[in-house]
Amino acid sequence: MSKYGVMRGLHFQRPPYAQSKLVRCVKGKVIDVAVDIRKGSPTYGQHVAVLLTEENHRQFFIPQGFAHGFAVLSESAVFQYKCDNFYHPEADGGISILDESLGIDWGLAMEEALLSEKDTKHPKLAEFDSPFVWNQEPGAKNQD
């Protein structure tokens, strides 16, 4: 369970342990975000943000090659994740959730944000060398 103001991300796993995720909020309300980090992608650095609540029952799919993050907008929130690969700490990576160049509206003031020490150390997108490469062929995996 996470409380109001908790922000996590923007996380991904490097190949060969890359993950796709299907997420939903089973209690509370969150803004959930995916950022395209595939080199060469026409949407590189762009994001999609979705409001997930226990009332709207929406799910959000984050494919491999996208960084994932969220902010809790209710008193508390509980997530449910489905992943297509196991967690591998040695493959853990991230982009700064505070990178203003991404233009993400997190729905709360940064003074209210509660970040883990780990999440304050991720590089900004401009300083990041992505391990993912965009492949425009249908059905192709988007990684090196």
Regions found by a protein language model. Give the residues of each.
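Non-catalytic, conserved peripheral segments adjacent to functional cores
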Residues: 1-58, 74-76, 83, 88-140, ...
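Short alpha-helical functional segments enriched in proximate histidine and acidic residues
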Residues: 69
